Amino acid sequence: MAFGAFIRTKREEKGIQMNDFARQLGISPAYWSRIEREMENPPKDELIRKAAEILGINADDAFVEASRLPPDMRENVGNLVRMYRKQATGEK
């Protein structure tokens, strides 16, 4: 499921109107409508996290639906890649 459809489904399950949801996020309803209809890419990380919080869902699930790693995991993955490359090349 794409991010917009995922969030719309969760929002509707909670009985939250789209205009009210956008207002809670501090963005225009028109912009959020475009996100839910997949006319816009998923929003910035802070909006994904805030949307998950409002909906009471795991933020990691929302990031996965947005085809992104959560910010803390990005750093960890980067560190692992650097460590692997150092070990593979014998770099100290």
Predicted regions and their residues:
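Short, basic-rich loop-to-helix N-cap that marks the start of a DNA-contacting helix
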Residues: 39-53
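Residues within the helices of the helix-turn-helix
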Residues: 8, 19, 49
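The alpha-helix within a helix-turn-helix
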Residues: 11, 22, 52
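Short alpha-helical DNA-recognition segment
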Residues: 15-34
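A short, Lys/Arg-rich alpha-helix, primarily the initiator
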Residues: 1-13
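Short, charged recognition helix plus adjacent turn
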Residues: 61-92
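DNA major-groove recognition helix of helix-turn-helix
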Residues: 36, 47, 66
